[in-house]
Amino acid sequence: MTLKASEGESGGSMHTALSDLYLEHLLQKRSRPEAVSHPLNTVTEDMYTNGSPAPGSPAQVKGQEVRKVRLIQFEKVTEEPMGITLKLNEKQSCTVARILHGGMIHRQGSLHVGDEILEINGTNVTNHSVDQLQKAMKETKGMISLKVIPNQQSRLPALQMFMRAQFDYDPKKDNLIPCKEAGLKFATGDIIQIINKDDSNWWQGRVEGSSKESAGLIPSPELQEWRVASMAQSAPSEAPSCSPFGKKKKYKDKYLAKHSSIFDQLDVVSYEEVVRLPAFKRKTLVLIGASGVGRSHIKNALLSQNPEKFVYPVPYTTRPPRKSEEDGKEYHFISTEEMTRNISANEFLEFGSYQGNMFGTKFETVHQIHKQNKIAILDIEPQTLKIVRTAELSPFIVFIAPTDQGTQTEALQQLQKDSEAIRSQYAHYFDLSLVNNGVDETLKKLQEAFDQACSSPQWVPVSWVY
């Protein structure tokens, strides 16, 4: 059974609250004066292909088309790359393929995408390969003179788009990238400002907060998803699964998520569009980790130390109550028929069975905790992350990894293997990763990070706002 999130009224109200917060943030930004950038010293002079430097712009001379040629001169005194890539168009003319945002040429504003280069320092570029021309541009120093025919097409304004990377990328290891030196290296979770996406395969971006101002090439979502899908198709069909959820353990068929797991494996990820919001309170703390990593100890410690702040939602079960159990305290006890009806109505965010009895956590239970202005703690399976990662629940997702200290026993090695399997498939959902070298240390780091997330600007999925 595929798990689905409910679409109740509370979800709509939370969505509106974050939308209003974002709108207020945008209005405040628009009221601030924009910084003015000053271009580098560049000399340009217009002429025409008949050699005339006349100020007019004749369309034809004696029945022949006359194209405007621009002479561009500037001095290159450092080893800094110019920040452009070249290509040959259908007429085998050398044109500017892309200009890297923040690079030397971009700061000058002297060239634009589509400009045709005729000469480099007096040398005609005809009959030269792109590699030869790129090398010439890279190695040239001192005064540089270019003759170009400007591209007359309109130029679009700069983009204002931010994406969270959902995979690690190293351009030096990419055989598809047209220029490895122009690539941008990033890691899962990095926020990338998208500068240009004119090329359907290679976008330009820069990592937010990086000291490097110039942009670099990154694979577009379409290219990355095609790449991953192609690799998956070429992989052996009988490859063994590294998922830790197939082994026998408590709640071995928890959440009936085998179909969800299959779809997770086919769900190719690349980037997630995000927006930056002012500080707001996260309503749910989600703990993710392999079985035996210590999530229960951490959860129980949070509940006992901060009962006024954190609450664990009481689960529902079809198991008969024991003599010492009180309905609504450890469990809500319901019939199998009622629970089956509730599952069909998508009232459970997760559910499963153990020893013939069904267990599950309802959305409504979590909502009731939020209405008390408290934070709900969930220790769920990773397959459920898609369902809880919404504006309605506003989760802060923490991955708990096993200790990397002490003796490497067989059990610890298996735990580390299971943990890595979860990380490799779901890391793009994590807000924080912690190594559990001790409950006290982990608790301190977790609470500090959670408080920091609730009191400072945050990057959230654009779906939380729009």
From Swiss-Prot:
One of its GO terms (biological process) is signal transduction. Palmitoylated. Essential regulator of neutrophil polarity. Regulates neutrophil polarization by regulating AKT1 phosphorylation through a mechanism that is independent of PIK3CG activity. This is 55 kDa erythrocyte membrane protein. Its main location: membrane. It comes from the Eukaryota. It is a lipid-anchor. Residues 158-228 form the SH3 domain. Residues 268-466 are annotated as: Interaction with PALS1. Ubiquitous. Signal peptide: none annotated. GO terms for cellular component: cell-cell junction; centriolar satellite; cortical cytoskeleton; membrane; plasma membrane; stereocilium. Belongs to the MAGUK family. It comes from Homo sapiens (Human). The gene is MPP1. Keywords: Acetylation, Cell membrane, Cell projection, Lipoprotein, Membrane, Palmitate, Phosphoprotein, SH3 domain. Heterodimer with PALS1. Interacts with DLG5 and NF2. Interacts (via guanylate kinase-like domain) with WHRN (via third PDZ domain).
